[in-house]
Amino acid sequence: MGIKYLPVSVASTALSFVGLQVWTELSLDRLRADGLIAKNISLGDSEHALELLLGSYFTIALLTNFVLNVYILLVLSLKTLFFGDLYDVETKKLVERLANYIIYKGTFLPLVIPPTIFQGVLWTVWLTVLCTLKMFQALARDRLERLNASPSSTPWTYFRVYSVLFLVLSVDMFWIKLSLMTYNTIGSAVYLLLLFEPCSIAFETLQALLIHGFQLLDMWINHLAVKNSDCQRSKFIDSMTAGSLLEWKGLLNRNLGFFLDMATLVMALGHYLHIWWLHGIAFHLVDAVLFLNIRALLSAILKRIKGYIKLRIALGALHAALPDATSEELRAYDDECAICREPMAKAKRLHCNHLFHLGCLRSWLDQGLNEVYSCPTCRKPLFVGRTENEVNPRTVEVSSDEQLARQLERQNNPVHALATGLFPAEVPDSVENDTSRNLGLDPSWLQTWSSQGSDVAGPSTTSRTVGLGRVQMMMRHLASVGESYAQTALDDAAWSLWPMNPSQASTSSTTVPPGNGGRTGGLHLRTVSNTTNESLTNILAMAETVREVMPHVPDEIIFQDLQRTNSVAVTVNNLLQM
């Protein structure tokens, strides 16, 4: 599908048009010679002449060939205009996705469609249009992701690819209108199937427009600031937009993205439910496949809802842990964020009265080592007046961690492998019986803001007994999940019969670098003493961090996931989807 195919497509389309025209003239001359039509065809005789022409299979073949060539020419022209040459990875992914879509969406249509020529042509055109829309949507999303990661991309290049999403949405809305008119005209329940997939594509396209629209806006603002650095109007625009762009981006991506994500899943579920209702239950193999697909979609919907609820709880905890700066403070300081050097429409205030964007502060705390978190400006500790036990309330569990380390070491030694499991059975009653663990929050979090509510920020001089590890890890999780939640929700699941397991989607997109001591890939603990001790130390430290954020998750599940992923962020992502 490279640019070199475009001249070939133009020549093929021209030849097919000439061949169709020549054959039509010869057919009309033969019909005139037989006396079936008059020499001068009037408007009233045109319908009869067209019926006679379409009575020939060769005419239908030439017409089909011409339409197919026009379609290929149109696709290649749009591809050349918006994308240029495709990368090898894009071409490979495109072929795989289209094959999956045709198999999983077109296979079930013969079960409910009457075997007539009209029905065959109608549903073939329907599937072709949907495949084309999905193809351009997927190409646009993949290319936008590549441009977003490229430092040399310009706003114009980004907008050229971004406009493909508007084209897809416009054609899809027009197709939905035609499908609705067809259903209203014929009135058969079969034609409701014309609506589910176009609506699903519309929701997916709106989701992509939302996510990449913020990226385009951010790129345009940065480009404008660099180009017109001395222009007062540019500075005014920056002060009005840059400060609140991050807040609006996270809010809309999280809430509106979740709604569009759920709408896409519901449309896919409705498509298969309607096919099952039209086909009936006959206890055949196809019924089992439909049932498994419906079950997987229902499971994905429930997991998405549970993940969104957990994310909302985490956001409330984070906003309570770090108080918001008031409008009076923002006007009094009239400062910009010391991390991103952008104006602040909303900010979080530390106890030292320095203000920062929540996202910037989240990234700063993500760099903290050994729970030594300081203000980016004055380097004062973020939370003062706290004892060592308050900073790390789980240090009393060192004995259990030592037991875990010893059992992990035995497990990695084939001579001392344990058949009964990896983790100790002894768990403190105070941890297991704490009801607040069922909510995913530690009691030390709840005690400090239960009387204020999650959105009320205390004074800057008030010290809060908030676990720094929990704040840091919660910020890391919200950075990796909250902002990209809507974007990665249906990237590959919408193409397959069964949606991808969220844990598989997370781990498959994460590359774990080789560790020290010859470890490659995932976490493989060796029997060598130095490597084993280092690996045990790392996994215990990561388990402690995950345990601070999600104390309600059993230790066994945390350690098993960490051994598979060797990443705290990926493990938190996986546990949130449970």
UniProtKB/Swiss-Prot annotation:
<dbReference type="InterPro" id="IPR013083">
    <property type="entry name" value="Znf_RING/FYVE/PHD"/>
</dbReference>
<dbReference type="InterPro" id="IPR035667">
    <property type="entry name" value="RIN3_plant_CUE"/>
</dbReference>
<feature type="compositionally biased region" description="Polar residues">
    <location>
        <begin position="504"/>
        <end position="513"/>
    </location>
</feature>
<feature type="zinc finger region" description="RING-type; atypical">
    <location>
        <begin position="337"/>
        <end position="379"/>
    </location>
</feature>
<feature type="transmembrane region" description="Helical">
    <location>
        <begin position="58"/>
        <end position="78"/>
    </location>
</feature>
<dbReference type="GO" id="GO:0004842">
    <property type="term" value="F:ubiquitin-protein transferase activity"/>
</dbReference>
<dbReference type="GO" id="GO:0008270">
    <property type="term" value="F:zinc ion binding"/>
</dbReference>
<feature type="transmembrane region" description="Helical">
    <location>
        <begin position="161"/>
        <end position="181"/>
    </location>
</feature>
<feature type="transmembrane region" description="Helical">
    <location>
        <begin position="272"/>
        <end position="292"/>
    </location>
</feature>
<comment type="function">
    <text>E3 ubiquitin protein ligase that acts as a positive regulator of RPM1- and RPS2-dependent hypersensitive response (HR), in association with RIN3. Probably not required for RPM1 degradation during HR.</text>
</comment>
<dbReference type="InterPro" id="IPR003892">
    <property type="entry name" value="CUE"/>
</dbReference>
<keyword id="KW-0812">Transmembrane</keyword>
<keyword id="KW-0808">Transferase</keyword>
<keyword id="KW-0833">Ubl conjugation pathway</keyword>
<keyword id="KW-1133">Transmembrane helix</keyword>
<feature type="transmembrane region" description="Helical">
    <location>
        <begin position="111"/>
        <end position="131"/>
    </location>
</feature>
<feature type="domain" description="CUE">
    <location>
        <begin position="538"/>
        <end position="578"/>
    </location>
</feature>
<comment type="pathway">
    <text>Protein modification; protein ubiquitination.</text>
</comment>
<keyword id="KW-0863">Zinc-finger</keyword>
<dbReference type="GO" id="GO:0043130">
    <property type="term" value="F:ubiquitin binding"/>
</dbReference>
<feature type="region of interest" description="Disordered">
    <location>
        <begin position="504"/>
        <end position="524"/>
    </location>
</feature>
<keyword id="KW-0611">Plant defense</keyword>
<dbReference type="Pfam" id="PF02845">
    <property type="entry name" value="CUE"/>
</dbReference>
<dbReference type="GO" id="GO:0005886">
    <property type="term" value="C:plasma membrane"/>
</dbReference>
<dbReference type="Pfam" id="PF13639">
    <property type="entry name" value="zf-RING_2"/>
</dbReference>
<keyword id="KW-0472">Membrane</keyword>
<dbReference type="GO" id="GO:0009626">
    <property type="term" value="P:plant-type hypersensitive response"/>
</dbReference>
<dbReference type="InterPro" id="IPR001841">
    <property type="entry name" value="Znf_RING"/>
</dbReference>
<comment type="subunit">
    <text>Interacts (via C-terminus) with RPM1 (via N-terminus).</text>
</comment>
<keyword id="KW-0479">Metal-binding</keyword>
<dbReference type="GO" id="GO:0034052">
    <property type="term" value="P:positive regulation of plant-type hypersensitive response"/>
</dbReference>
<protein>
    <recommendedName>
        <fullName>E3 ubiquitin protein ligase RIN2</fullName>
        <ecNumber>2.3.2.27</ecNumber>
    </recommendedName>
</protein>
<feature type="transmembrane region" description="Helical">
    <location>
        <begin position="6"/>
        <end position="26"/>
    </location>
</feature>
<feature type="transmembrane region" description="Helical">
    <location>
        <begin position="186"/>
        <end position="206"/>
    </location>
</feature>
<keyword id="KW-0862">Zinc</keyword>
<dbReference type="GO" id="GO:0016567">
    <property type="term" value="P:protein ubiquitination"/>
</dbReference>
<keyword id="KW-0381">Hypersensitive response</keyword>
